[in-house]
């Protein structure tokens, strides 16, 4: 996908950038693979905000994506590359030879007419899904399972890829996009290639309204709030907040480690890169 810049006819258009969508071959989604999901606005079942700065946005239908790739041994033809409003990556519509249709995340260099397959005997080419045990070292992979049969959970964003760096015992060592090297069971499935739409991270939204179309509400600084709303709020005139930066609940930010999941620490060979 190339990046298209707009003419500066207004302040909002001056720095705005769009994708060209030349890889999209089908405009309307497959009816059998969509469903309507009610928006939560960042609230949980109790009605409390658990994820701030969410709400509004354009109406959208959820595409049912096959992250498990459990239809093994049956080849499928790529019928279309489609836009998905729920993610940065594109979707590939697969038509299996037995008549079933499924969506998968479209990797780089996957085009209409290509044949893809999943299973231990599949070839090493973009779009094919295999157990890590059957993938050569150094291969770029995405949509990686962390638990056997649960479906891909990591490396699914636009332009991302992981790399298989080692195999030892019943585990494989996978280098994730963050730089973290993690142990994953060799029986877990992964898809070959890099996730498509690589230029997605380079797009400039250009104006606040476009952020609202995506369902993202404004983020307000703590020092601009009142003391009742934030630990750094209040003060006469502008202030520094009077303490180290923190969240609205007093948790330190700016590099403070919050990871508490000690049960999975043993699977991390190397921690992620510092920002």
UniProtKB/Swiss-Prot annotation:
Cysteines joined through disulfide linkages: none
Gene Ontology BP annotations: cytoplasmic translation
Matching InterPro entries: NA-bd_OB-fold, Rib_uL2_dom2, Ribosomal_uL2, Ribosomal_uL2_bac/org-type, Ribosomal_uL2_C, Ribosomal_uL2_CS, Ribosomal_uL2_dom3, Ribosomal_uL2_RNA-bd_dom
Region called Disordered, residue ranges: 222-275
Keyword Ribonucleoprotein: yes
PROSITE patterns: RIBOSOMAL_L2
Subunit structure and binding partners: Part of the 50S ribosomal subunit. Forms a bridge to the 30S subunit in the 70S ribosome.
Its job: One of the primary rRNA binding proteins. Required for association of the 30S and 50S subunits to form the 70S ribosome, for tRNA binding and peptide bond formation. It has been suggested to have peptidyltransferase activity; this is somewhat controversial. Makes several contacts with the 16S rRNA in the 70S ribosome.
PANTHER family hit by this protein: LARGE RIBOSOMAL SUBUNIT PROTEIN UL2M, RIBOSOMAL PROTEIN L2
Protein name (record): Large ribosomal subunit protein uL2
Record gene name: rplB
